[in-house]
Amino acid sequence: MKKPILGSHVGMSKSNKHGEYLIGSVKEALSYEANTLMFYTGAPQNSVRTATDKLYIEEFNQLLKENNINKDHIVVHAPYIINISNPVNQTTWDFGVDFLKQEIKRCEDIGVKILVLHPGARLKGDYTDALNALVKGLNAVASSQTNVIIALETMAGKGTEVGLSLNDFKYVIDNVNEPEKVAVCLDTCHMHDAGYDFNNWELIKEEINKTIGKDKVLCFHLNDSKNPLLAHKDRHENIGYGYIGFDNLLKVLWDEEYIDIPKILETPYVEDKPPYKEEIENLINKNFSKKVK
């Protein structure tokens, strides 16, 4: 059987101890024995960005080639400050569209195809109005997308978030002008917190097939959850230490139907240290033996 495509969130900054910018991102992933990676192109909480020609793209490509990492499996995460589901504040929506266009351009420059985006929050607006604002926003950025596909992330339902249900994503995909430019990222913690029970992964797969279709799943965020089913909290837990459990996450990772889809760990650091090397080893060996805490 094929080996899963498994990596984690890694840094992408001048000060990464593994190396500057994209060089450090790949070297950090390799230190975890990962075969893919996810990074932000700048801080997730602000709009300050280093020009892409300073990110060592050529060296990045060379490192990927030398280490047999398929660039098509690499994921970029859009910053949290984009909210194109906001139906009540035009300024916020306009900023989100403009900044998302910039992020798309940066992904095009780097050559990464998968851009994960949080759908956003409705604030005081109506839920359907928020989904329509999201559709409008995705239509507004579509002309910027040449190779990049936006993968909307499933959300936990914290506050006024939209995108809790696979039906939300079906609605968006059905209504955008260019559906081929929109896909989905399944976050296991968020889905669990929104009410999807990973004790029955087969049932979740049926729901995927009935709504968005499995071809629309571009990546997974593989996380355990600190909270029980339907908690709407969004607090990630280390693999095997939460309410989803090691065996259930193993089923997702090794599922033959999704074996070629990248899975990304976003689990918490333990005592300021990344747990990813141990978590990847446990998941690949199908053995919960390396304790991270």
Curated annotation (Swiss-Prot):
Pfam families: AP_endonuc_2
Key word Glycosyltransferase present: no
SMART domains in alphabetical order: AP2Ec
Catalyses which reaction(s): Endonucleolytic cleavage to 5'-phosphooligonucleotide end-products
Listed cofactors: Zn(2+)
Enzyme class: hydrolase
Gene Ontology molecular-function annotations: deoxyribonuclease IV (phage-T4-induced) activity; DNA binding; DNA-(apurinic or apyrimidinic site) endonuclease activity; phosphoric diester hydrolase activity; zinc ion binding
Note on cofactor: Binds 3 Zn(2+) ions.
List of residues binding Zn(2+) 3: H190, D234, H236
GO BP field: base-excision repair
Binding site for Zn(2+) 1: H77, H118, E153
InterPro entries: AP_endonuc_2, AP_endonuc_F2_Zn_BS, Xyl_isomerase-like_sf, Xyl_isomerase-like_TIM-brl
Residues binding Zn(2+) 2, per UniProt: E153, D187, H221, E266
Residue stretches in coiled coil: none
EC number, as in UniProt: 3.1.21.2
Gene3D superfamilies named in the record: Divalent-metal-dependent TIM barrel enzymes
Keywords from the UniProt entry: DNA damage, DNA repair, Endonuclease, Hydrolase, Metal-binding, Nuclease, Zinc
Family recorded in the similarity comment: Belongs to the AP endonuclease 2 family.
Function: Endonuclease IV plays a role in DNA repair. It cleaves phosphodiester bonds at apurinic or apyrimidinic (AP) sites, generating a 3'-hydroxyl group and a 5'-terminal sugar phosphate.
Protein name: Probable endonuclease 4
